[in-house]
Amino acid sequence: MNTQRIIRHLWVALLTAAFALSAQAAEAAKPRIKILATGGTIAGAQASQSEYGYKSGSFDVQDLIKAVPQMKDLADITGEQIVNIGSQDMNDEVWLKLAKRLNEVLAQPDVDGVVITHGTDTIEETAYFLDLVVKSDKPVVLVGSMRPATAISADGPMNLYNGMAIAADPRSKGRGVLVALNDVIHAAREVTKTNTSSVDTFHSLNRGPAGYVNTGKITWFQVPAGRRGSKSEFSIADAKALPRVDIIYAHANMSTDLIDAAVKNGAKGLVIAGVGDGNMTAQALERCSAVAKSGVVIVRSSRLPSGLTYRNNEVDDDKYGFVASLELNPPKSRVLLQEALLKTKDVKEIQRMFNEY
């Protein structure tokens, strides 16, 4: 009897130890994901739920992690606050700080991916900037929200959960920087905000989404176009600032005043958000040609939400010395031109970059 009891106790002890080791192994096998927080509506708070207005960046990264405890089932999570601002205040200084820190984090062997929380107003610009300068093929996912954290039916928690699931998915590797909101995964190069307040505001209008994500379950569609990650030629490792590039919006009866003002105030490049296929008035066209001859790089894009700005189509880019943006909208054309100007002012070389990125 004593022998049977001893054997039974031994079996219980062995099973307990086995389960403990299995749990430890499962915990150790979880992807290690770091959240870099920058503020935005996802960290925003209302004065009351009856009011539409709110203050961005009211909660820090630890608050966001605590608000979605289910993420712990997906990954081993750590968090770091980079800034805590509304994304309308995002600027070159913060971009450089974020990008340099992101590259440091991704270079660590104990980090498998990164989720970045960000305001939605400029999330597409930040995502594309990072897509150009990140030196790793590990997953990087930007998430945000259209409703503040204190709102009824806030969308931030699910967006953060889905972003964590994407970053933890091994299939995310090599897809470049991604943006995930409202159950849709977008490539940084493609995504744009299309509505001022709807949760279904982000769309990839030219090529479509990169995939879908529903309660952490991911369906991938396509690998995004363009060079990125370890294949990118751009680097901000030694950059202290980015060249000034301004966007000029074309319209009926467009004058040259804003073109002149931008150049006078130090712009090294101009992106024309042109009508139709990147066009502008005759006087604006001639002034841009003169500006291009002076060494300021001119990129033609379109103010329309989708379509391509073709080279030498309506405008003779060879004659005027312009760059055609192709698929890139004005904000992303500005980002790529800033990076290009860190390397060269040669228009043909910059056109190559627009062709490839």
Q: Each predicted region: which residue ranges?
A:
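Bacterial N-terminal signal peptides that target proteins for export
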Residues: 2-13
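Bacterial N-terminal signal peptides
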Residues: 11-22
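ATP/NTP phosphate-donor binding region
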Residues: 26-105, 286, 330
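Accessory alpha-helical/coil subdomains and C-terminal extensions
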Residues: 30-31, 36, 60, 64-71, ...
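Short Gly/Thr/Asp-enriched flexible loops that form oxyanion-binding sites at enzyme active sites
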Residues: 116-138, 280-289
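Short, acidic/small-residue loops that bind anionic groups at enzyme active sites
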Residues: 127-158, 164-168, 293-302
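Internal gly/pro-rich beta-alpha loop/helix module
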Residues: 143-214
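C-terminal non-catalytic interaction/assembly regions of soluble proteins
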Residues: 277-357
